[in-house]
Amino acid sequence: GHLCSSYRITNFRERTHGFHRAVREHGMSTAKSIIHELSPSIEGAFSDMLEIIDSGTPLAGAYFADNDLIAIGAIKALKLRGYKVPEDIAIAGFDNISEGRVIDPALTTIDVPRKFMGQTAAAQLIRELKTPVPHSVKIEVSTTLIKRFSV
């Protein structure tokens, strides 16, 4: 399943596309995927996930969340309602924020090289201040799976 953000920004849309692509690449149907839309904050995702659980909506056995905040909020809601993570439902996040290391169970996540991204963005800004570029620049960076205990 996918815990997608209720905010419609490019990063989250790209993660949704990546989720669907991975589902198809593993021979599964995206039509059968369980997708829940949650607020992209711990508190918002917690509240939204409680509503989903309490409504009786079917839950997936595993979820990829658009960010770690959503994953952490969902884990807290699942645990409050008696689910065991990862035994009943596994969850992986994206961003590798520090809160993911201290939640129980520690969150499996995708790490992004934030320092490199910041340095690259600053260098690009300086270049554009010196010589304006009439088009946007998109730079893709590699990510790393950080295996912890939520999967």
Model segments located where?
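Bacterial carbohydrate/catabolite-sensing allosteric modules
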Residues: 1-151
